[in-house]
Amino acid sequence: MILVTGTLPLQPSQKDAALDAVREVQRHTRSEPGNHAYEFALDIDDDHRLRIHEEWASDEALNEHMASAHFAAFLERIGDKLAGAPEVVRWDGATSRPLFE
């Protein structure tokens, strides 16, 4: 399992346009083979910061996503809407289980 987490700082004046770009990339990505989760959420303490959570079955699935036309289009659309550099981290993990059983 590959996890991707991070944040995207948004320019306040570009927040709505950024959210439109996110909705579009989510629509395509959630149906990709090997994608288990593709979520963005506004930070509870800063509503101009998006939190990223992705889950992928394999390196291959993540690499195919990153090479896709819709992800390239997202990068193009989101770039000028950011207030700073994105902070995105990839995590490699083998197992998961419910925290509260």
Q: Regions from the language model: what does each represent?
A:
Residues 71-77:
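Outer-membrane beta-barrel domain signature
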Residues 37-39, 73:
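Intrinsically disordered, low-complexity N-terminal regions enriched in serine/proline/glycine
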